Curated annotation (Swiss-Prot):
Bias type Polar residues, positions: 59-76
Family in the record: Belongs to the SNF2/RAD54 helicase family.
Signal peptide: none
Zinc finger (RING-type): 920-964
Protein name according to UniProt: DNA repair protein RAD5
Region (Disordered): 1-129, 348-402, 541-564, 982-1005
Cited SUPFAM superfamilies: P-loop containing nucleoside triphosphate hydrolases (SSF52540), RING/U-box (SSF57850)
Amino acid sequence: MSAEASPETGRFRTKSSPELFFPATDSEGEEQNDVPLTIVHPTQSTSSKFSINIASSSRPQHGITTGDFETTSQTSAHDDVDDDFSIVGHNPASSHPQGTIVAPRRKRSLQQAHSHHSSSSSSPVPSAPVIRADFRKGFLGEFVCEGWSLSKGRGYCSPGTKIVIERPKSKSTDVGAPKPGRKDSGPVRLVNGKVVGGVKSKQMTLGSMMAKKVEPAKKVKATTDQIIRFRNERGFEIGRLSIHEAGFLTHLLDTGVIQLSGNVIDCPQNLTTGCTILLNIKVYLARKAFENFGKHKREEHFSFWKDQRETAMEEAMRLRKDSLRSLFERIGVKPIQSSALSKVTPIQGVLNRQKGPDLEGSRLRSSPSTSTAEEKGKGRAAMRAVDDDEEDSGDEAEKLDEKQMNEIDSIYRKAQQGDTRLDEMDPPSTFLYTLRPYQKQALTWMNAREKGDSSVRNESLHPLWEEYLFKKDQLPGEPIEISDDDEQPDSTRKFYWNPYSGELSLKFPTSQNLSRGGILADAMGMGKTCMMASLIHTNREEKPAGNLESQTRDGVEGEIDEEPASKRIKFKQVTLSNQWRAVPTAPKVESFPRATLVVCPVSLAAQWHDELRKMSQQGSINSYVWYGGDRVDIEALLAGDGKERVDVIVTSYGTLTSEYQKWLRTKDRPNYEGGSLYDHEFLRIVLDEAHNIRNRLAMVSKACYELKGQRRWALTGTPIVNRLEDLYSLLHFLRITPWGNYSFFRSFVTVPFLNQDHKALNVVQYILESCLLRREKTMRDKDGRLIVDLPPKTVEIKVLQFSRAERQIYKFLEERAKKRFIELDADGRAMSNYTSILAMLMKLRQCVDHPLLVLGKSGEDGELGEKILESGAGNGEGNLRDMIAMYAGGIRAETPDDVDKAYAAKVLKELGEQEDTPICELCSNEMFDEVLLPCYHRSCQDCIVEWIGTCEDQNKIASCPSCGKGPIKLADLRSVQRRHKRVNPITDAYPGGRDPNSKSSNDTTVTLGKVDLVTSTKLRALLRQLEEIRQEDPKAKALVFSQFTSFLDLIEATLTKQGIRWLRFDGTMSQAQRANTIEEFGRKTNEPLILLISLKAGGVGLNLTMANYVFLMDTWWNEAIEQQAIDRVHRLGQNKPVYVTRYIIKGTVEKRIMKIQRSKTALVNASLSNGAKTKETTLADIKKIFGMDEEDSEGEVY
């Protein structure tokens, strides 16, 4: 028989009755110090009013005074604290009604009870939460819910009965706990020189030491129940809350976030098991809810190489966030002030998307160790090294299509609305250039950003937080107070909630954006270098207000600054002279940072140096190119003074990456003495063409992240290339919180946008308005004038027709590639053989430029290309290699070689005496690439070759179109080569310096030779247009762009043969060679000059306004890259009309790529170029490129 108290009288009786307040099962199976069962009687000091708030797990700290919202009795100060469930705010000696039996309890010290609160967080919340000493709890609100009775009989409750709500203590099973058979002798301690205590184990022997170690057993986490019980004030259990209500309350009660109280609204007089009881529940936020939560170092749970599953801390954050959100919705709590972000983004949708273990976004697919079978099935190659020119920044599925890119453009326009109203600021007199009005406005904005006067007010609410108000807890019988809407709420009743992380705070979370810098994203050719140079002159060395760098880094991904190497204790080298002792030397006293570090592509390093020299008054700004063999000791470079002072250091992304890798290898060595870029803090860090760091996982990005600088700037015309996460990398570099935190950025920027949540655009706009300045050439100022007045630009697309031989080679190659693709697609193996398909597409694009390019190997795809070349052999059709060899060598001449001599002797005199340019009989235009027929008539090479091919297609004998003599074969044609002597301006100016018997400088030498059939259709079109330009403007300069350096080689040889002067600029050249090329191209000349330039190496950043003709020889995968190439010429400083010519071949992949660019994706695929073999293009796009789209029509213009 068990002794119990009657629910009516409190007297003991010997019969079964409801469970007691502390059930015996709570302490079963635990090793603990037992306390005898005692009957606690009420004392005089017992409060007449019982508080019915329940806290789980642990007690609050002692000594806390009366709270603002509820008066409670003092807790007694004793050393042992009850770790079971207790009533908050009551003396343990007086918290139980008379006759209640207190069950055994486990003792734990107060210090131990609260030791688990000292973790850290990566969320942008105040580092140390400020909780008022008198704060105990705040009334959040109340709601009505149902409960289920677990008791039978009368007297348990009635309408108005106050109830106490509690949770049964959770238990976890430790598989690795000591076995019951082993004796625990208490804590380990030292007694008489011997270690005693602890669980006894076997003695360690040599055999046991050599035996295989057994991994410790993992703790088995017990499943969390959702049972919340409620009892009356006399301690008798009445029932439990419904599962629907208990679902979101369970976690909050277990973690001590909330306290609950309530009363019965309605219930049956005679309770039965399972009957419904209507309850009114009051919810209070406890003091513990505002303590540090979720603060942890990122390194403790995130590793690129470790298992990327959700950690326990992340799970706790997610459960807390979801539970609080459900609670707020259940009570109907609304914020009194929403952040700017909350006003533009649907929090509900963002939070729903954050459910589950993907708190860190796409970490799973970022790990190389978690490659799936599906990825292997798609034929992805191994991860390649990321260089400066080409990087992958994420999954192909997250690329933005044309519609989404247009939405990004609209964001830019909205963010630019207020830019025309910026004030204008003049640079100091040491800056020699005159800024345009929009550049002066940019200087105003940049200066304000560096001074900390950003548009975001320091006292504005943090964009991730919302402001709420505690309600007034109305006691029963008190009149209901109606607050005035105009009345300012009491500041002590305010609290703040972060719906994205679940954190709560009593302190106002300000939007303290400590970043001093931003993104200058003006369109290409608007003078970003000039504007940054003016800023360097405006803001020189100054004393920093504090360690701003460390402050900003703390809020971004939990990173922690290491101690600079220059401040560490250094050691001299150990030698015999110092007797093998390491002698510490005092750290050097560093001056305030004064130098600006500019990181740019290697092709722009010399340009930065030259531009700074031209724009600066002599001696005001000294710059140094830190690259290659010129990398002197950085410490000595920064320590220079006077004439040796260096204000700007210019380096390349490749050099910085190399320095970063070296620093990682040596920085932790005990004898490391510094001397790296990463051991010094710079006044300003500038990333030119900053989209080079768009891949957050690339080594070049990490190298930029680690740089130390007080101010940070990113210069790029394309902050978002093709993914929203391109923007994240810039924000992370700039230390802009919270957007520089990847989990936050992905949670409510990337994922909502990809889910077509259009309100996510407003979030991006909100971000950009605070840190980005972007103007375009088409924008107008406040007076309606264009902010940039540039000469007109004319873009012409020349659609060319293949020659007969080229068409045969291309069709042969296309049919084989298409046949192979159809076979793979039919078998469902297209994507698993993706690399092979890309190799075939590459060969097609090369064949369009010149058939000889197909013979070359393209990196790792060369072997696949060889298979294509050999295809068709043995089936009577010949193979592709033989066809190209026939094309390159022409038809072998059947006439002997001595025919040339007699042939030439007869006509050379006549040709040399002619002064007028002859007219072609076939095209009725001036002859280009003049050839001589056996009948002495002449024609354009293209015209007569096409004429002969047409006759052969019609099974006719080719004859001369002028006289009808024939037959004519290609071997019978002779090329008329007229070479004009180059004019020497020095000797030509002084007739005495020339031999009077010599011929005039305008004399032309005429020779005959075999017809060169190696030139392609595009090459002939280029030469024809260059010849026209030479006739119109003898001093013209032009750029010829191609993505294939092998094609540039062929163009180079052809220009040399034609006597046209050229220069070369590509990725194989050193920085010094590139600088010399640009310098040579900029010099004045009296003859045409052509710059052959690689699209990848010279497509961005260069200032080539000395030219005004641009030729794009092939179609690039991204139209924006082509536009960047054009802007090398059409930019500030250009005073001539710009003419752009794009060559495409009708009926080829070029036409189809352009169609896809314009109509669908604007991003066919980077994998169509060399090296990008890990992308995924949709099958639909591949079919269109192969010409398998039914809508594809050859009748289109292109």
